[in-house]
């Protein structure tokens, strides 16, 4: 037995080394448009005889010339490269620079053997800590984004491993990869189409193209030449790679293989579509650049000022200056931000998963909350992708059937006015049952039932086998128990459906009535009506009048305008148990009845019309409410489908996407637009697109993005993949979605429910709010640290940080202390703010604009204001413990100053930590007081308690004293720290009062 995976991996070899040029050889080889030329012309263009196919020798020559029938794939990105890409961040560059400077300072100091100086450790501790931080962040990012892009490989998996072809006049089964342009492929029910081709023979051929075109039902195929170019879904004389045959047989000339097929073009689009940064990633990069630029400017200002005033006298001055640069870099960069952001987003991913939304890329969690437009495919996304009989129109009236999908659960509902007349109601219901019985008898579909246990309960699922339209008739018949009317019938012959005949019939014998034969027919109402001479009304049969015909045709038109697919139903009792006794029936040479399929003229006439059925792929019941909620949240829903314009407009109207009477714009109309400006004007107002190709979907998404929208694109078919990948956030259906779409998407809906998107939007908006909260909290700490270092250096003489007469630079806080604050004491409260519950108004706000900053000018004002206050109280607290500062004029020697400086640093260190704990309470809202809902987030209080325990540890555990340059503090010193830190909270409350007063 051949292993399937191994077979596929052999079939789809990597042809990327030639950048698709080699694969492009397999583009369409005809010199004419195959859908607009007759089959013989196409055959001549490809040099093939329709009766014998290619010779083996010619097929081999073409395989060598055009290459294998496979899809090109891009070379995988090496793992090491993916890991290194995690370091592509301005803040990381700044920290790497700080690491380099720290190492230079350490090497210089070691080389000059300066004992006792700061940074004179046996190992470059600062550099080691920073590098470890960077590695941890990179590993976290790599783990989250390690899934390789497999979209093209998934596209490849759609192709059938083997194909029947005609070569040297014989049908042979060959590997699909060996199919070449000019081959004659032989198609039968259940086959997958292995290449694009022009049909030249078709018998009752129907092909499922939903994954490629979005068409809900299998498409009837014919060999007629098209009079003009048509959209992909309307090319009835063409077959396409990756689709499948649901009924009938056919033969086609291969016109395109590999990357030249329609699936290949989509694969090429996916290769050409680059992954863009999410809005959140762009914002974080912007913040990184702002911080990096600020610290560089401050460092240059400080170093230039020191050079002009102090000068660099010896190696001590160089080392001190380098350590100052490291301190500034460490102070400016929120080292824990990347890890905190990753954890907060990961927690959001878990919460979304509970709502059946599986997010593949972390940053996409927030992006969905920012979406201003949701572009959705129709089939399988907004609708169930399960054809359903909704209306049955009989000569006496009409009934509606409840229930959707393939579960045979529902009932007949008669018009309320008719309900008052029991006799009329009974007649209509009886006629409806008879109509559905005919539809279920003249049927090749099958409804399969399967049971599955889930805990103590057993769930039943229903599977459609065959044409979905035919299965819908079986489902409808079972809903009204019409199966009882045909339980005794046994099929003895069939006249199959063809696209030319537009009808099908069976001959069945009634075993409960001496085997008497009846013809049951169904088909396009206008066609079937032409073969009817009688009509069944109220339990009696009478001649069909011209008035009856006009009324039936008017009903057909009305149903069609409502996007229903209509099927007429008729029958004819043959009055005998023997076909041979039917007048006009032909016998063969042996005296037996000739093939029934060839005797439609005899059997399909004098039919009795019983009624017609309206079928539709219904909208999902919950989607209308979801569309309305999205609208209230300022989110526009756009339908983009390959289906018929009438169907698209009807579904869109039902769901509230457009108003009643609204229409759909087609792909051909989009092609007529002259330029991007005209295209953008259309997309700014149109909300329904029909009969569109994958290229159109991609252009629509790109146009909406050009207008400043954050676009989410949902879909399930392969035709959706390029647009799904290009959108700011692509959303794939988990159950009905093709593998290629799942791989292209950033999020997958496990329940295929459009409504799940709304829950995900709510979660995304809440996450965005929380990101703003902890960014305000973290960055105010960093700004406070930068101003502490900057102010401490520039005012060192006034504050007593540098004793009178000394030379060189003394940094107020050590880099290791700043790292402790940024990584440990700040991290827990930031994480706690990241899981704050969403506010009630989160879905009442309009989506944020693409130009809106995560940190806007007002928030920067908050951050800088709090940061300056933090720095001021920190430096004041340090000064109070240093002789020769603002609060004391006592002199101190170098040794005494070093001891005081250690205590002062411990004070400043602790004041900053206390100030940040109080700032955590204030940062939960830009306007509301910190005392509103003070205890609503229990995790925040737990985080504050943890941070305080860590601060106690770094001050009172001896080996941490040594590592972080701290000393134990007295009770009085703790009171001082808390009192000074309270000034930060008081200042924040006063600022909020002023803002609220405005």
Label each region the model flagged.
Residues 2-847, 854-855, 868, 909, ...:
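Conserved cytosolic headpiece of P-type ATPases
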Residues 111, 862-877:
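Alpha-helical transmembrane segments of multi-pass integral membrane proteins
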Residues 302, 834, 871-883:
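Transmembrane alpha-helix/helix-exit interface in multi-pass inner-membrane proteins
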Residues 794-814, 880-903:
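Helix-coil boundary and interhelical linker segments in multi-pass alpha-helical membrane proteins
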Residues 825, 905-920:
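Generic alpha-helical transmembrane segments
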Residues 850-869, 895-907:
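Membrane-water interface at loop-to-transmembrane-helix junctions
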Residues 923:
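A C-terminal functional module that forms or caps the active site or interfaces directly
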């Amino acid at each position: 037995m051949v292993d399937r995976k191994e077979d596929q991996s052999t079939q789809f070899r990597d042809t990327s080394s030639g950048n698709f040029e080699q694969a492009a050889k397999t583009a369409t080889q005809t010199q004419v448009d195959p859908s607009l030329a007759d089959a013989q012309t196409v055959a001549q263009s490809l040099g093939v005889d329709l009766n014998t196919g290619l010779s083996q020798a010619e097929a081999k020559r073409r395989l060598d010339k055009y290459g294998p029938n496979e899809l090109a794939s891009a070379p995988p990105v090496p793992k090491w490269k993916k890991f290194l890409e995690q370091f592509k961040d301005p803040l990381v560059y700044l920290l790497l620079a700080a690491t380099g400077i720290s190492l230079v300072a350490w090497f210089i100091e070691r080389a000059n053997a300066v004992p006792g100086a700061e940074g004179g450790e046996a190992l470059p501790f600062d550099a080691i800590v920073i590098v470890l931080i960077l590695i941890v962040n990179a590993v976290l990012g790599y783990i989250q984004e390690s899934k390789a892009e497999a979209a093209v490989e998934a596209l490849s998996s759609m192709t059938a491993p083997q194909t029947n072809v005609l070569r040297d006049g014989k049908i042979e089964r060959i590997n699909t990869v060996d199919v070449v342009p000019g081959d004659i492929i032989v198609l039968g029910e259940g086959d997958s189409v292995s290449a694009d081709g022009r049909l030249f023979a078709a018998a009752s051929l129907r092909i499922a193209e939903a994954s490629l075109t979005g068409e809900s039902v299998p498409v009837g195929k014919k060999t007629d030449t098209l009079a003009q170019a048509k959209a992909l879904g309307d090319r009835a004389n063409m077959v396409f790679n990756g689709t499948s045959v649901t009924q009938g047989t056919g033969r086609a000339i291969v016109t395109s293989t590999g990357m030249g097929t329609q699936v290949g073009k989509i694969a090429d689009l996916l290769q050409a579509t680059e992954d863009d940064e999410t809005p959140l990633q762009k914002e974080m990069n912007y913040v990184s650049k702002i911080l990096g630029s600020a610290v560089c400017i401050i460092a240059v200002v400080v170093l230039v000022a020191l050079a002009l005033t102090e000068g660099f006298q010896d190696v001590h001055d160089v080392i001190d200056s380098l350590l100052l640069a490291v301190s500034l870099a460490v102070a400016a960069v929120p080292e824990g931000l990347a890890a905190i952001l990753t954890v907060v987003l990961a927690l959001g991913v878990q919460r979304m998963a509970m709502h059946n939304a599986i997010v593949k890329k972390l940053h996409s969690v927030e992006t969905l909350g920012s979406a201003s437009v949701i572009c959705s495919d129709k089939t399988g996304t907004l609708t169930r992708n399960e054809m359903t009989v909704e209306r049955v129109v009989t000569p006496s009236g009409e009934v509606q059937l409840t229930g959707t999908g393939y579960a045979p659960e529902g009932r007949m509902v008669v018009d309320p006015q008719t309900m008052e007349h029991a006799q009329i109601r009974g007649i209509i219901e009886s006629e409806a049952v008879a109509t559905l019985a005919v539809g279920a008898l003249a049927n090749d579909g099958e409804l399969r039932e399967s049971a599955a246990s889930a805990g103590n309960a057993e769930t039943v699922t229903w599977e459609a086998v065959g044409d979905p339209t035919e299965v819908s008739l079986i489902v409808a018949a079972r809903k009204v128990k019409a199966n009882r009317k045909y339980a005794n019938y046994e099929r003895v012959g069939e006249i199959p459906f063809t696209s030319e005949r537009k009808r099908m019939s069976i001959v069945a014998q009634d075993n409960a009535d001496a085997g008497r034969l009846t013809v049951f027919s169904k088909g396009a109402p206008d066609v079937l009506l032409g073969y009817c001479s009688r009509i069944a009304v109220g339990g009696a049969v009478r001649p069909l009048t011209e008035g009856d015909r006009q009324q039936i045709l008017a009903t057909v038109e009305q149903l069609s305008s409502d996007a229903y697919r209509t099927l007429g139903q008729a029958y004819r009792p043959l009055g005998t148990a023997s076909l041979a006794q039917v007048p006009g029936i032909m016998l063969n040479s042996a005296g037996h009845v000739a093939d029934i399929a060839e005797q439609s003229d005899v059997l399909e006439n004098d039919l009795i019309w019983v009624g017609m059925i309206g079928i539709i792929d219904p909208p999902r019941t919950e989607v209308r409410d979801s569309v309305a909620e999205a609208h209230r949240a300022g989110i526009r829903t756009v339908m983009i489908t390959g289906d018929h314009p009438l169907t698209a407009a009807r579904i869109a109207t039902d769901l509230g996407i457009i108003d009643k009477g609204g229409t759909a714009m087609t792909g051909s109309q989009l092609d007529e637009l002259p330029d991007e400006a005209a295209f953008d004007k259309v997309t700014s107002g149109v909300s329904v697109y029909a009969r569109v190709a994958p290229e159109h979907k991609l252009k629509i998404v790109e146009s909406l993005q050009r207008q400043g929208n954050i676009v989410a694109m949902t879909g399930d078919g392969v035709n959706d993949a390029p647009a799904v990948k290009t959108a700011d956030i692509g959303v794939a259906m988990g159950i009905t979605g093709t593998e290629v779409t799942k791989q292209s998407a950033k999020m997958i809906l496990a329940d295929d429910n459009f409504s799940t998107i709304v829950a995900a939007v709510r979660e995304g908006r809440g996450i965005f709010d929380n990101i703003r909260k902890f960014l305000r909290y973290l960055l105010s700490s960093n700004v406070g640290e930068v101003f502490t270092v900057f102010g401490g250096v520039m005012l060192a003489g006034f504050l007593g940080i540098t004793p009178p007469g000394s030379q060189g630079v003394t940094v107020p806080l050590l880099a290791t202390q700043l790292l402790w604050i940024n990584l440990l004491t700040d991290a827990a409260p930031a994480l706690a703010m990241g899981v704050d519950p969403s506010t009630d108004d989160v879905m009442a706000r309009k989506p944020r604009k693409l130009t809106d900053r995560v940190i806007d000018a007002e928030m920067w004002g908050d951050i800088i204001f709090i940061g300056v206050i933090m720095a001021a109280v920190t430096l004041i607290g340090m000064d109070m413990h240093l002789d020769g500062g603002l609060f004391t004029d006592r002199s101190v020697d170098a040794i005494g100053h070093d001891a005081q400086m250690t205590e002062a640093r411990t004070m400043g260190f602790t004041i900053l930590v206390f100030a940040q704990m109080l700032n955590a309470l204030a940062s939960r809202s830009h306007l509301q007081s910190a005392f509103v809902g003070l205890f609503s987030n229990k995790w925040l209080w737990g985080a504050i308690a943890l941070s305080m325990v860590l601060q106690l540890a770094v001050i009172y555990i001896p080996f941490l004293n040594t590592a972080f340059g701290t000393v134990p503090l007295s009770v009085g010193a703790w009171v001082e720290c808390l009192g000074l830190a309270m000034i930060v909270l008081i200042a924040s409350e006063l600022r909020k009062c002023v803002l609220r007063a405005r």
